Every structure is written in structure tokens, then in C-alpha cells.
Amino acid sequence: MHHEVMSGLHVNSLRKHEILRKEQLIAALFVSGKSCKGEYLKLFYQKTVSDVKSRSPAVQVLFAVSKKNVPHAVSRNRLKRLMREAYRNEKQQLFTLCDEGRPEMSGIHLQIAVLYIGGRKSFPSFELLRQEISRLMHNIRLSELT
């Protein structure tokens, strides 16, 4: 089986440094970022530009499921695992959008928050989440990022 490899790593991996954890970036993302909404998920995104060659990846993401929407921790954790896996399978769309090899994209970083907004009655399947993440990521246009 042939796996695509990017910079010595598998394209579909989700590395630890790709997870958005900085509180200031997260706060700025929710205050000044743009958003798009699907049936189960809401995606916030914003670009940042750094003058200095940053060691952070071109795209960083966070996943959140509200305790209010999903009161049981086991269900919240399962949804976050499904969301991470769906993103991991579809993230190549964003890496082609933020291709670090293109000079006009130099120093541009994209932060994304994927929030579960569906109800607690029934949870979406992995395939539905994957399709919705793909659709939402497709809504992020290059013209909005440059």
C-alpha cells in the first residue's frame, strides 16, 4: 500500500504541534475570526502573518464539544476523536491552500476551531462528520486568506 509522504511525515497524520493550544490565539480566533456553519459543526478560522520565520505549522486546529450540548464525558470524547479523525483525513485541502512552497503564502498561518453544535439526541456518523468538515474547509477561500 502506497502512502503519500510530506517532509518525511505521513500527510494524514495529526502531529502534536498542529493542535492549537495558545490561549491568546484561541481568544483572537473567536473574537476576530470568520466562521462557517454546517448541520453538526461550526468552523472558526483566521489567518495570522508573522515576519519572523515561525516554527509553528502553517495550519493549527482545535476541537471542542460543549458540555451543555453533550453532557456525558464519554460521548464528548468520542465526538472529539471522530472530529479529529475526520479532519486528519481531509486536512490535505488546507495544506494545498496554505502551501508553504509558494512565496505569497510565506509567513501566513491559519488557525481553525472546529466546534460541535449538534444536539445530544443522536450523534452523526464518522462519514457525515468527514463530509461536513470537507465542505466547511472548502468554504475557506484562498482570496479570504491572502
Curated annotation (Swiss-Prot):
Pfam families: Ribonuclease_P
PROSITE patterns per the UniProt record, alphabetical: RIBONUCLEASE_P
GO biological process, one term: tRNA 5'-leader removal
Protein's organism: Chlorobium phaeobacteroides (strain DSM 266 / SMG 266 / 2430)
GO molecular function per UniProt: ribonuclease P activity; tRNA binding
Keyword Isomerase in annotation: no
Lineage: Bacteria, Pseudomonadati, Chlorobiota, Chlorobiia, Chlorobiales
Gene3D superfamilies noted in UniProt: 3.30.230.10
Similarity field: Belongs to the RnpA family.
Gene expressing this chain: rnpA
NCBIfam families documented for this protein: PRK01903.2-3
Keywords: Endonuclease, Hydrolase, Nuclease, RNA-binding, tRNA processing
InterPro entries: Ribosomal_Su5_D2-typ_SF (IPR020568), Ribsml_uS5_D2-typ_fold_subgr (IPR014721), RNase_P (IPR000100), RNase_P_CS (IPR020539)
Catalyzed reactions per annotation: Endonucleolytic cleavage of RNA, removing 5'-extranucleotides from tRNA precursor
Function of the molecule: RNaseP catalyzes the removal of the 5'-leader sequence from pre-tRNA to produce the mature 5'-terminus. It can also cleave other RNA substrates such as 4.5S RNA. The protein component plays an auxiliary but essential role in vivo by binding to the 5'-leader sequence and broadening the substrate specificity of the ribozyme.
Signal peptide start and end residues: none
Quaternary context: Consists of a catalytic RNA component (M1 or rnpB) and a protein subunit.
UniProt-recorded name of the protein: Ribonuclease P protein component
Keyword Nuclease carried by entry: yes
Enzyme Commission numbers on file: 3.1.26.5
